[in-house]
Amino acid sequence: MSTVVIIGAQWGDEGKGKIVDFLTEKCDYVVRFQGGCNAGHTVVVGEEKYILHLIPSGILHKNKKCIIGNGVVLDPSGLLKEIETLTQKGVEIDNNLYIAKHCHLIMPYHVAIEEQSEKKKKIGTTKKGIGPCYTDKIARNGVRMIDLLYPDVLKNKIRANLEIINFLLKNLYNAETLDETEILTQYLNYAEKLKKYIADADILINKAIDSGKKVLFEGAQGTLLDIDHGTYPYVTSSNTIAGGACTGAGVSPRKIDNIIGIVKAYTTRVGEGPFPTEIKDSLGEEIRKRGGEYGATTGRPRRCGWLDLVGLRHAVRVNGFTGLAITKLDILDGIEKLKVCVGYKYGNSILEDFPKEIQILEDCMPVYEEFQGWKESTAGIKNYEKLPDNAKKYLKFIEDSLKVKIQIISTGQKRDEIIIKESPL
């Protein structure tokens, strides 16, 4: 098998970065296919902690080709800061990073309009301009990476967009307008620094696959934040599910061999939106502290709750997972009783399928099965047989309920704190 897609199976923050980092050792290419700098992938190598927002996690390995695909919306300023930080730490960027020509760019007016609209309609965005950038993409008004190399095209697009945006900022939001010349100068400066990375990414990826290279597709956020299949409107602005790897990188579904769902051993969510299994007492706070559940991008505390099999069954269905990776199992060490949601109570009915109506989901109560916890530490365990019996029972229940095999179990933050039951590559 030469290709694998890594997908978050919950509301993001499942620990995808570590799994991608681990699997990259066996890969030749790592491709980011959607999202923007609203994602934060944390990877710990030795004593060094890296937080990556745009560049694929594979960049931390030598001689791995990392590609930012056309499905990503890219903030040039954020990317340059990330490149600078990694370079200062001795990471080689120049020969290993490629950016799709038709990747869309986040502009200052995207950030400005999102900041203003979020004041009126609170969804819980990161205020990074992600949504407005995708809006321009769909409306066919977007600025793309390749436009940086054509100053007249860039100037005309900025001017046309500012006519609308400045009108809204001034008349609807009573906010400061933006200067066309200032933005153009800023982005032409970015062009000089980034032009060496611009490439026909889809051609590179397909040639790599066709020649037998191993390619890993790295998703951002999670299934329940998908624009179509998530808890709309409390979602991100892109397709976070496995199908997004094909559209966001330019590859055929026939070229995808494995799809791995990343599942945190409990559930977290950042920002607004329904969360049926949320733990609102001191245990929720304890899990947050143990797991370091604070956003890598915003620093916002994550809401914590029990594992939700209803949401996970939905994720299995829309992604077609061939395997699962369970993360943060060690965070549950020492908790006397564990709960797993197996259904939702809605009125007099028990729902086994994830509701598409947000108003129904908001009124759902979780139906739990309880499990005896384990007192022994699982931290750093690398052999499945050495896990406590109750931890194995917990994992077996997940596997049996979802009818998908668990291939990987993460038992800590560090790269080598991991159990491989079966390699997806």
Swiss-Prot record:
Annotated SUPFAM superfamilies: P-loop containing nucleoside triphosphate hydrolases
Pathway of action: Purine metabolism; AMP biosynthesis via de novo pathway; AMP from IMP: step 1/2
Cofactor mode of binding and number, as noted: Binds 1 Mg(2+) ion per subunit.
Chain residues that bind Mg(2+): D13, G40
Subcellular location: Cytoplasm
The UniProt record lists the keyword tRNA-binding: no
Cofactor annotation: Mg(2+)
Residues noted as binding substrate in the record, renumbered to the chain: A296, T297, T298, G299, R300, P301, R302
Active site per UniProt: D13, H41
Residues that hold GTP according to the record: 12-18, 40-42, 302, 328-330, 410-412
GO molecular function list: adenylosuccinate synthase activity; GTP binding; magnesium ion binding
Catalytic activity, as annotated: IMP + L-aspartate + GTP = N(6)-(1,2-dicarboxyethyl)-AMP + GDP + phosphate + 2 H(+)
Residues noted as binding IMP in the record, renumbered to the chain: D13, E14, G15, K16, N38, A39, G40, H41, T126, R140, Q221, T236, R300
CDD domains per record: AdSS
This protein's UniProt keywords: Cytoplasm, GTP-binding, Ligase, Magnesium, Metal-binding, Nucleotide-binding, Purine biosynthesis
Entry keyword Nucleotide-binding: yes
Enzyme class: ligase
One cellular-component annotation, GO: cytoplasm
Function: Plays an important role in the de novo pathway of purine nucleotide biosynthesis. Catalyzes the first committed step in the biosynthesis of AMP from IMP.
PANTHER family in the cross-refs: ADENYLOSUCCINATE SYNTHETASE
Subunit annotation: Homodimer.
Name of the protein in its database record: Adenylosuccinate synthetase
Natural source organism: Thermodesulfovibrio yellowstonii (strain ATCC 51303 / DSM 11347 / YP87)
Name of the encoding gene: purA
